[in-house]
Amino acid sequence: MHIYEHGIFVPGAKMVTFLPFAGYRPNLSNGEHEVDRISPPYDVIGDEYLKELQSHTHNVTNLTLKQDADKRYHSARKELDSWIESGALKQDEESFYIYEQTFDDKGTQRVRTGIVGILKTEKYEDGNIIPHEETFSKVKADRLNLLRDMEAHLESIFGIFEGLTPELNKKISDNARLVYLFKDQAGVEHKYYKLSDKDICKEISEQLKDQKMLIADGHHRYETALNYSLENPGNEKKSFVLATLVASDNEGLVIWPTHRMVDTENISEKNAIKGISSALTTQEVTREEMESGLKDHMMGLMFKSGKCFLADYDSGDDPMWKLDTYVAQEKILKGVYKSDEGKATVSYDAEYGSVKKQMEEKKHDLSIILNDPSLQTIWDLSMIGKRMPKKTTFFFPKIWSGFVFYLMR
């Protein structure tokens, strides 16, 4: 995909500001390993896994998810300060970091490579930083309180940009130094490199300033960082957010769908099927036929009774109706189940195997099985100012936290 084809590139115009920084990162000692310090993003960690992570004194979750709710923001600040004072964290010279994740994608091994630096926050209406999903205000309020007290970015947003020249990519590969290597429970290998060559760092910033950036993951973190920047006008350090940027043509840029599971006591299965069939073109099929029939915006429906359907919608000229998450939201969740009126509960799961197991155990009234979102479609809609429904995309693997922090003091 070439972003320039959509009229985004403006020769000579200054767009994003992406810079190296003097990051603080784990100083492993006394037999410590990377696993003791890092974690998935705070919003995808279950309770049991959190207990395991927080059993390690210097794990990042002891900062991002402090349990003492009354004073947790202030205590997290004190904890971070103590890590710095004790040498548990060390500060680098100004650097970019290269984050490489090797993973299995449905039988194919892929490598996703991102550049980690600090990104200057801007209002969306400036047109340089592009969102693609709606966000939850409650989550943003919690993160803003943490940011105010910490004066540090502990977790990275994930962005997509056009890319760097092959010559610059080779320079990066030749000069980056491996600092961390870790394989997680899902079999994803994480490699973290430090790049401190001033000339190469300057060249990265120069090439990025003529590009725009799509937020792939971390809308809450970005919007929180922007609000924090607006609270601190004139403070340059506080106008930046920690960001991992991946080129749009990177072969490891994989997007999974996030399936919807519905629970309700307000409509029977028979009436729900009737309502959906009047709003969409449906065909009753076996589960195997449903799985093989998923394509474009043809979605699958699995009911508690075991009945399965394929459902389609004539999208017409409106590009939003080409997005099956939008069709599911408007025609099924809101249209039939009245989820926007509180008459149904919607939960989300990106792993089809997990959804299938839950439906076999009859845990939900309905599961809506969606297709892999197209990056091109996401770009096209984002460029015309469209926000997609929450949980439209699941970029796999997630960007892990704890490899490096950005302090704004």
Q: Would you name each region that the model predicts?
A:
Residues 2-409:
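Surface-exposed, charge/polar-rich loops and edge strands
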